[in-house]
């Protein structure tokens, strides 16, 4: 079937979108101790990178409520992947180009966090709107791709570090940036249906007036913070706290958590 008419391609692009989000959230944490040794960062500065990533994604989630409906799902999801690609590429180059390594890292994190936040709010509704059979199975499989993407990030990156050396981490950062670039092109071609009829859509004021919304929001923030804390700091703890090698730390920490 044609890529422009088959919703199977839409679902596949969405799966790759969640893998992209896994790269955005979980690649840099594998390098926290490398950033510390190469760039002279403190643990407090590294912690702020994690906080910045999480906070910007939350902010983008809130701001996208109205923006997405006005602009459209396709341009927004394509832009999300371009932001992700730009951030991952910037991770490799900006710390050196700016002369201030920490400022470069923060700008890179800001870029890919914007992409990750948009992907988070766009991909599920896009799949939900696809006129396909077994939608429940497709949605369940969709959300599992974040975990499989997390595993892939750790395994592929660890294999690269073993073969090429941790000092060449900028190369694999650029290689990971190719994934969202390719998927941006993919999303520009696949069919995307409107998720909700505008006449039936709740206004932001109505949504904010529901107590259940605030309860679910609190649960999501707490769950997201816990997940980010575990996935992003497990490698550092295993390597520096337990004294194991980086390879064992990455496999036992973030990879084990993802599984």
Where are these regions (language model features)?
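Extracytoplasmic
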Residues: 9-43, 124, 230-235
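Extracytoplasmic gate region of multi-pass secondary transporters
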Residues: 28-30, 210-258
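Primarily marks hydrophobic transmembrane alpha-helices of the MFS/SLC 12-helix fold
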Residues: 74-77, 105
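C-terminal ends and interior cores of transmembrane alpha-helices
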Residues: 82-99
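Cytoplasmic helix-loop-helix junction between adjacent transmembrane helices
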Residues: 108-144
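Helix-loop-helix hairpin linking two adjacent transmembrane segments in secondary transporters
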Residues: 133-134, 141-192
């Amino acid at each position: 079937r044609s890529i422009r008419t088959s919703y199977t391609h839409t679902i596949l692009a969405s799966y790759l979108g969640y893998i992209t989000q896994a790269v955005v959230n979980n690649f840099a944490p594998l390098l926290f101790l490398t950033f510390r040794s190469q760039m002279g960062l403190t643990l407090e500065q590294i912690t702020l990178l994690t906080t910045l990533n999480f906070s910007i994604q939350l902010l983008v989630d809130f701001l996208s409520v109205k923006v997405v409906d006005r602009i459209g799902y396709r341009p927004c999801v394509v832009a999300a992947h371009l932001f992700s690609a730009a951030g991952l590429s910037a991770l490799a180059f900006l710390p050196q180009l700016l002369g201030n390594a920490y400022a470069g890292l923060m700008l890179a994190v800001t870029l890919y966090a914007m992409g990750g936040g948009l992907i988070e709010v766009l991909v599920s509704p896009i799949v939900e709107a696809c006129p396909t059979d077994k939608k429940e199975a497709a949605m369940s499989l969709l959300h599992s791709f974040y975990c499989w993407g997390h595993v892939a990030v750790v395994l592929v990156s660890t294999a690269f570090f073993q073969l090429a050396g941790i000092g060449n981490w900028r190369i694999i950062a650029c290689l990971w940036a190719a994934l969202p670039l390719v998927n941006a092109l993919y999303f520009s071609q696949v069919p995307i249906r409107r998720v909700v009829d505008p006449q039936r859509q709740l206004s932001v004021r109505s949504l904010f007036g529901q107590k259940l919304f605030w309860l679910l929001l609190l649960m999501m923030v707490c769950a997201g913070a816990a997940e980010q804390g575990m996935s992003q700091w497990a490698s550092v703890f295993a390597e520096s706290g337990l004294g194991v090698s980086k390879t064992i730390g990455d496999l036992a920490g973030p990879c084990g958590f993802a599984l």
